[in-house]
Amino acid sequence: MSSRPELKVDDEHGFIRFYKSLPQLGEEAIRIFDRGDWYTAHGDDATFIARTVYKTTSVIRQLGRSDHTGLPSVTMTVTVFRQFLREALFKLGKRIEIWASPSGRMNWKVVKQASPGNLQDVEDELGGQFEGAPVILAVKISAKASEARTVGVCFADASVRELGVSEFLDNDLYSNFEALLIQLGVKECIVTQDKGEKEKDPELAKLRQIIDNCGVAIAERSAGEFGTKDIEQDLSRLLKDERAASLLPQTDLKLAMGSASALIKYLGILHDPSNFGQYQLYQHDLAQFMKLDAAALKALNLMPGARDGAKNMSLYGLLNHCKTPVGSRLLSQWLKQPLMNAEEIEKRQQLVEAFANDTELRQSMQEEHLRSIPDLYRLSKRFQRGKATLEDVVRAYQVVIRLPGFIGTLEGVMDEAYRDPLDEVYTNKLRELSDSLVKLQEMVETTVDLDALDNHEFIIKPEFDDSLRIIRKKLDRLRTDMDNEFAEAAEDLGQEREKKIFLENHKVHGWCMRLTRTEAGCIRNNSRYLECSTQKNGVYFTTKTLQALRREFDQLSQNYNRTQSSLVNEVVGVAASYCPVLERLAAVLAHLDVIVSFAHCSVHAPISYVRPKIHPRGTGRTVLTEARHPCMEVQDDVTFITNDVTLTREDSSFLIITGPNMGGKSTYIRQIGVIALMAQIGCFVPCSSAELTIFDSILARVGASDSQLKGVSTFMAEMLETANILKSATAESLIIIDELGRGTSTYDGFGLAWAISEHIVKEIGCFALFATHFHELTALADQYPNVKNLHVTAHISGTDTDTDVITDEDEKAKKKREVTLLYKVEPGICDQSFGIHVAELVRFPDKVVRMAKRKADELEDFTSKHEEENGGGLGVQYSKQDVEEGSALLKDVLVKWKDEVKSGRMSKEEMVARLKELVQKDERLLGNPFFKSVQAL
């Protein structure tokens, strides 16, 4: 960071005037000025970059004379600029405009634009390694009071030239829209602008909150851009099919078409003629994949978060042993789109099993074949946009010549059970694609000089053209002369060639010699040798003869390149026609890469994963034996305690888990969600045996950490998440609730937790897991047979009862209650609270712990005394039978009393006296424990 470029601008005042005349971009956008081999930013953007990249404002320089009229500016090297670009687009969700002045002074214009969902212009600067495909989505809603809320979306991953549309009904919390954002892994969302401060649309505000919760960048566009007037004409220019766009069924989705119109304008697709006739339009069906809400995404740790240190902290990091960038991106997509069709899941499982059982097949795929595959989607994109070079053609060729290796390895599978599935999904497709690409291979072999690749030279074969052949001969002769000069120098200096002294083609100095730094002394004070530069790897130097040869060589190389450039253009043009085939190949290899990665994880886990049995949708039960949390078991210093899980419709569809803090409740309920998701993406699962039903959604309510930053209290965030769950859950959902009702008073919190639990059990009837500290909630199991109580166990040694006999303070300390958490989940209720134990674990001051214990004991004494005074606490002093019997006896007395007093002749006092008399006469009623507790006369 120390070697920042110096701020040198030709016409300072002219640039300041120009910069200040530019319109404001708003907080979300940043302007960068490209000045050749360095970059600058100015004004507020300079301050932002100084704080974000350099972490100090001392790097800001003033352009112009004084602070008053000057312009705060900051400079960046190419490396720092690229680092900032990644940070701004991937983490901060900013839009970037890059300005350049191609034809000299003060002729600035925007040459590149980028945003989190549109990285096309800056792919080269970013280096092409992204976790997921940058998907950008536009959304338009219709929420009239008389109609149901309808949401229309259009989305695109610009790198694969596909437009997806979808239109669906939604509830007032937009749960379906949230599920869609997560399914697609959207990075940026285009919404309509509010008309003004006075006319704020509450529906739009809700939409923004959801987009924000999912960590998606927001771009605003005027309502006019969502108009559908020109959309049919635009689509007919973009789509591959020649048929009129108006005949497509998707054009009836008016809201989605409005979104498509805004998206096409935002991406500027129509400005690039290479896009015409290249796009495909498809309709996305929300119901074909399991739905996940934003809370589930966090609760299950699907994707790496900003705070995740180790790779294995997220499921994506754990499962990502992909060897290709396309494989990693497909894995990211699969994790957000778990399948709902048992047949499709089993197909994937069968393929995973093939690679898991055959170690040789798996290792040769990973180490020999997949490792050498470049990012074919990005490569294809370079061809389509006319940016490809001969090097890109060679990279495509190198993939083609490796295909027979893939096919041969797959054909070597002997087991009949796996042979057919592998043939269907991979071998046959690869054979067909390999045949289609044979012509590309032949063309490269006849036109490109493959021998020159060893020197990292990408040139056309000299035999292909007479003038090239003549220049090549001269170049070869010069190369020989250089080698001779090198040999002479090595002998003269007494250095061993290729060990101490080297001949290299340096990117700045051209052909020159290099000595290791330890041997560099031998050329000092020797007039024959001219030193070029000293770098980490040694000292570069040359001789007058070598310098002359190098100049001639460079001159001839330029001639060669000029002569071959038209031939190169032809070769690149022919290779570009193979883009659709390369994209199909990319899809097959990405699928293969993810499946092999699943197999690798399943075999290399601390305890191997097993293939789960999947029941058809709407049937069966979920039974997991010795289940483990996949991310937790691979952490260092963790010995994971396994637990069994049984979820059946009639007996245990709602599990209430009580127990001490840090006892493993959260891990237990989350691991069930993670295992269900792993099973539905076709992966093996961390159990000793497993059978699962298919869930249509996983909905979670877990800790809300950053809600205050968005102006929402923790309790409010909790209620919003829960409302979302209750509105979007169906009978086939899996609900995970980790604590509920903690952010309010104990009584309100318990009331809400009870009511919500009862609603899930009675009205929704889905599978649910509820970890709670409200021990009273366990009474639900007495009312509903499908509610089961579980608790996490703890071993308690020592007791407090006999401490008053012990006089020695040390002995007292030894005798105090020791709690050992066992992390085992057992049936039944946990009858104690362990909050103070956790305080002891984290070394709270002794004084605070003692005070807490005293207060807790006082409260317990007060409660028990209060209950005794009232004839025993509810649910403690009498049985269910007592309640039924007491109620019946009381009813008889009241009916008898009612018959006597209905004539209306008695006064109020006489009526009360008569009722007391009847009660006193009934000995059975007076002896009933339940009646004693409710007696109020």
UniProtKB/Swiss-Prot annotation:
Keyword ATP-binding: yes
Residue positions binding ATP: G659, P660, N661, M662, G663, G664, K665, S666
Cysteines engaged in disulfide bonds, as pairs: none
Subcellular location(s) of the protein: Nucleus
UniProt keyword Transcription, yes or no: no
Single GO term (MF): ATP-dependent DNA damage sensor activity
Annotated InterPro entries: DNA_mismatch_repair_Msh2, DNA_mismatch_repair_MutS-lik_N, DNA_mismatch_repair_MutS_C, DNA_mismatch_repair_MutS_clamp, DNA_mismatch_repair_MutS_core, DNA_mismatch_repair_MutS_N, DNA_mismatch_repair_MutS_sf, DNA_mmatch_repair_MutS_con_dom
Swiss-Prot/TrEMBL keywords: ATP-binding, DNA damage, DNA repair, DNA-binding, Nucleotide-binding, Nucleus
Cited CDD domains: ABC_MSH2_euk (cd03285)
Entry's Gene Ontology BP terms: mismatch repair; mitotic recombination
Gene3D superfamilies documented for this protein: 1.10.1420.10, DNA repair protein MutS, domain I, MutS, connector domain, P-loop containing nucleotide triphosphate hydrolases
A GO CC term assigned to this protein in UniProt: nucleus
Domain of life: Eukaryota
UniProt feature coiled coil, ranges: none
Family: Belongs to the DNA mismatch repair MutS family.
NCBIfam families for this protein: PRK05399.1 (NF003810)
Subunit field text: Heterodimer of msh2 and msh6.
The protein's role, per its UniProt record: Involved in post-replicative DNA-mismatch repair. Binds to mismatch-containing DNA.
Protein name: DNA mismatch repair protein msh-2
